[in-house]
Amino acid sequence: MGCGKTTIGKLVSKRTGMPLLDMDALIEEQVGKKISQIFAEQGEAHFRALETALLRYLVEHPQTPPPVISTGGGVVLRPENRELLRTLGFVVWLNVSPHSLMHRNIRAANRPLLQTENPADTLHRLWEERSPLYRETAHRILNTSRTEVGEVCRCVCNLAERFFSHQ
C-alpha cells in the first residue's frame, strides 16, 4: 500500500523486457469495477478471493516469458496466496516504514482500508500485521523508504538475475 509495487514493477518490466501483470488493474478489468468499489460493495473477503483465483490461474497457466507481477498489499494475508506467489517465481518485499507509507498515502482516497477515523493508526496496524507475512513470503527484502525508484529497480533486477541464475 504505497510502497511502489506498481511503479517499480513497470520499471523492472521495461528494463527486462518481461511483461507487467498488475493484479489490481487486471482484477478491475475483469470485474469492471475499481478496487474501492469491490471493497465497498462486496467486501474485502471477496476481493481476496479474486486475488487467490488470479494467482491460481497464473500458476496453472504459466506465461512465457514470465511476467513481473505487481500485487496488492494484502495479497499475503491468505496462506495459499503466499505459497502461490513463491511458486510463481522470485518474490521481493519492497519494505517501507509506516512513517514513509503514511507520507505517501496521506491523500490516497483510492485506499479503501485507510478510509478510517485515524488512517495513521490503521496503516501502522496493517504494517504490523502484514510485515511477518511479507517476510515469510519474500525471497529478498529491500528497504525502499529512502531509496530512489531507479536504484530500487536496479536492485530488484540484479537480485532476480542472481536468483534465476542459481536455479
Predicted regions located by residue number:
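ATP-binding Walker
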Residues: 3
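Walker A/P-loop
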Residues: 6
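NTP-dependent small-molecule kinase module
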Residues: 11, 15, 90, 128-167
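Post-Walker A helix-loop "phosphate-sensing" segment adjacent to the P-loop in P-loop NTPases
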Residues: 14-25
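ATP-dependent small-molecule kinase phosphotransfer cores
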Residues: 23-86, 111, 124
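Short glycine-rich anion-binding loops that position phosphate/pyrophosphate groups of nucleotides
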Residues: 72-75, 97-99, 147
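A glycine- and Lys/Arg-enriched "phosphate-lid" helix/loop adjacent to the NTP-binding pocket
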Residues: 88-132
